[in-house]
Amino acid sequence: METGTEKRVSARITGRVQGVGFRNFTRRRARRLDVTGWVRNESDGSVRLEAEGPTDALESLIEAVHEGPRTARVETVDVDWSDAADAFEGFRVRR
């Protein structure tokens, strides 16, 4: 993917990713990378991430969520890429 191009990622993260600070970890990393969007816990125990920004920043964010905070145990990260829709302002944790 072309560096600097605005893209959107939709990701589903599974493993021990709830109750371990995963959403706040993701929010901090996204804000540091100047990525917009949101992250939330899902009822099936996974975490959902929707984010937009430069391709290189999103790639860095996806690398970070593969690791997660020390207390997390990430099993899978399923990612779908699409064109950015400029749909978000800032980055937040959804409840």
Swiss-Prot record:
MF (Gene Ontology): acylphosphatase activity
Record-linked InterPro entries: Acylphosphatase, Acylphosphatase-like_dom, Acylphosphatase-like_dom_sf, Acylphosphatase_CS
Keyword DNA repair: no
Active site residues of this protein: 23, 41
Coiled-coil annotated residue ranges, if any: none
Catalytic activity: an acyl phosphate + H2O = a carboxylate + phosphate + H(+)
Gene3D superfamilies: 3.30.70.100
Record has Magnesium as a keyword: no
Keywords: Hydrolase
Acylphosphatase-like domain mapped to chain residues: 8-95
Pfam families per UniProt: Acylphosphatase (PF00708)
EC number: 3.6.1.7
Disulfide linkage: none
Record-stated family: Belongs to the acylphosphatase family.
UniProt name for this protein: Acylphosphatase
Source organism per UniProt: Salinibacter ruber (strain DSM 13855 / M31)
Classification lineage: Bacteria, Pseudomonadati, Rhodothermota, Rhodothermia, Rhodothermales
